[in-house]
């Protein structure tokens, strides 16, 4: 998924992608590889005409009046096309001036927004300002060779310098000739100081550069996956080889994490302050390594062809490599650690559609009614009303969709109401609701919701971890039920649980997925032995569990005999959703 998730943003992304494809932005980048000098790309005037340089600039300064949320959509598309030109440094400069405001914004924003002025930014260097002049090396300046306006960090401040008197620009050979950085030295250059603006400049630069990194990462991921599907070796597509699969999967994971971080950071720009600093640091920490990883793995998946001059892989590798020092992920991560130690955390808010308000009235009224009840009475009301686990089917939940669930979270948080935390018990009980008989549901569900009984999940074995169907614990038919023998391991909370949900092998003579049955085991029954495993922390949260002729009555078999794999897979799915929603760990009485 790209940064664009709304209909309007997806339309903008599509327009940007189509434009860059039609104007052959990647070809324009390639043309600069051996060009002696950097020039504006041939599509620059058309790009300016689309108004993208002013997307985020207030209307009174010649922009469109949108925000960073729209800007990063375009920047991601530019990254995917490895587009040349000073777009990125120009919009970093204009975003900073727009955030600071004042007379300097009135002076410079119109030119930056209409493309008559190109911007450059310097985040490092050693520049000092004495009165109204700037002195020192600005270091590596992105866009310095094409710019008319420079924003350079100077201590905690930012110096705004018009290229001209007192400014020396040298463009040495670049790792990425398609978008070059320059060495800029200031020697008494006239400067306007933006007091305390360095933080704003760095934050906004991180968000915008990270958006470009996401575009690079996503394009490299898609190129690698497409090539792996079509490249045949040893009589099959290389996409069928595990090592290649893992490369592509790692690329997807890195890209999606970075995408989410940039999306969130762009939203944080409206808040500014620590919220923006925190989110921008997260984006930089994730996006720079993602682009670097994906550019390198794209080269590896393509093999020898990717290290030829004619292939485009090295264009992406060059751009990703130059983004590493600009985004400085290690520095961002260290700052993020400091912010966390200071108690800064990201405020989580989501803009909900209009239909949320009708739901909100009902939820708020319920929350107000139960907020002053005792914890036990409050839990009972939550269970009876379905609010304890609102996404569960009725009558145990409310069959709530995503919008209703978010409204419930918001209103309960505002009222100080904590829903019970069921953890493993929750996802096991949901499976029972889905697959158990009415009698079994009546026996097991409500006591678990009341937190009278804690459950554990008895799936993993010494030889069946990720291969959950490779279990050897066996159940042998006896009068009235089954005798279970075998071992489970890594069973979280087995030492605390009253009941366990287990996979056992009831038919060893069929393929492994077909001979599995799911059963409920009383953890205090004769023949059950739980041995806690000591962890690196010194504590014990998971266990070995041994079964020695443990009797399980027929009434405690869940689903069809030999048909338990379907039930087990449902449980694993419920586990993933629960953990992803923050419902991990163990349920204990009074937990919330």
Across the structure, where does each feature detected by a protein language model lie?
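Glycine-rich phosphate/cofactor-binding loops in nucleotide/flavin-utilizing enzymes
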Residues: 2, 73, 92, 304-368, ...
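A short, Trp-centered hydrophobic/proline-enriched beta-strand micro-motif
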Residues: 114-125, 152, 451-459
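Glycine-rich beta->alpha junctions and the first turn(s) of the following alpha-helix
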Residues: 2-14, 79-80, 169-256, 348-354, ...
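C-terminal helix-coil-helix/basic helical segment that borders enzyme active sites and/or dimer interfaces
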Residues: 27-35, 233, 252-286, 300-302
């Amino acid at each position: 998924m790209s940064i664009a998730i709304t209909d309007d943003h997806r339309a903008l992304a599509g327009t940007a992608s189509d434009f860059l494809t039609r104007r052959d932005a990647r070809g324009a980048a390639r043309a600069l590889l051996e060009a002696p000098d950097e020039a504006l790309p041939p599509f620059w005037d058309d790009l300016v005409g689309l108004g993208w340089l002013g997307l985020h600039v207030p209307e009174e300064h010649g922009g469109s009046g949108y925000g960073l949320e729209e800007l990063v959509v375009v920047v991601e598309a530019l990254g995917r096309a490895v587009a040349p030109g000073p777009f990125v440094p120009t919009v970093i400069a204009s975003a900073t001036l727009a955030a600071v405001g004042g007379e300097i914004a009135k002076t410079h924003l119109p030119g930056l927004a209409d493309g008559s002025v190109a911007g450059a930014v310097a985040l490092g260097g050693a520049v000092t300002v004495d009165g109204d002049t700037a002195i020192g090396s600005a270091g590596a300046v992105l866009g310095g060779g094409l710019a008319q306006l420079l924003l350079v960090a100077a201590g905690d401040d930012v110096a705004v310098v018009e290229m001209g008197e007192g400014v020396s620009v040298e463009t040495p050979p670049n790792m990425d000739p398609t978008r070059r950085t320059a060495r800029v030295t200031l020697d008494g250059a006239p400067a306007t100081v933006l007091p305390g603006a360095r933080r704003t400049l760095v934050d906004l630069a991180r968000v915008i550069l990270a958006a470009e990194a996401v575009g690079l990462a996503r394009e490299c991921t898609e190129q690698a996956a497409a090539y792996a599907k079509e490249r045949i070796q040893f009589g099959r597509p290389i996409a069928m080889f595990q090592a290649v699969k893992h490369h592509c999967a790692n690329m997807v994971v890195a890209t999606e994490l970075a995408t989410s971080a940039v999306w969130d950071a762009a939203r944080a720009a409206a808040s500014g302050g620590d919220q923006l600093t925190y989110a921008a640091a997260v984006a930089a920490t994730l996006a720079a390594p993602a682009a670097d990883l994906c550019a390198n793995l794209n080269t590896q998946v393509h093999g020898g062809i990717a290290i030829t001059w004619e292939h485009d892989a090295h264009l992406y590798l060059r751009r990703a490599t130059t983004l590493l020092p600009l985004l400085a992920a290690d520095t961002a991560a260290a700052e993020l650690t400091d912010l966390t130690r200071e108690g800064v955390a990201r405020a989580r808010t989501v803009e909900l559609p209009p239909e949320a308000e009708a739901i909100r009235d009902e939820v708020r009224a319920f929350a107000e009614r139960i907020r002053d009840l005792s914890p036990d009475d409050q839990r009972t009301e939550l269970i009876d009303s379905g609010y304890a686990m609102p996404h569960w089917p009725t009558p145990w939940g409310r069959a709530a969709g995503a919008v209703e669930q978010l409204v419930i979270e918001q209103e309960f948080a505002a009222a100080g109401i904590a829903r019970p935390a069921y953890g493993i018990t929750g996802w096991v009980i949901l499976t029972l609701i889905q697959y158990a008989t009415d009698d079994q549901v009546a026996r097991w569900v409500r006591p678990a919701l009341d937190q009278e009984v804690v459950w554990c999940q008895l799936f993993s074995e010494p030889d069946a971890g990720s291969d959950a169907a490779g279990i050897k614990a066996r159940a042998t038919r006896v009068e009235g039920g089954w005798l279970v023998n075998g071992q489970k391991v890594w069973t979280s909370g087995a030492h605390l649980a009253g009941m366990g949900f287990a996979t056992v092998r009831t038919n060893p003579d069929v393929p492994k997925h077909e001979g599995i049955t799911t059963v409920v085991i009383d953890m205090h029954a004769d023949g059950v032995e739980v041995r806690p495993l000591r962890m690196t922390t010194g504590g014990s949260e998971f266990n070995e569990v041994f079964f020695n002729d443990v009797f399980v009555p027929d009434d405690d078999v869940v689903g069809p005999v030999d048909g338990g794999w379907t039930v087990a897979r449902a449980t694993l799915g419920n586990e993933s959703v629960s953990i992803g929603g923050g419902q991990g760990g163990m349920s204990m009485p009074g937990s919330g």
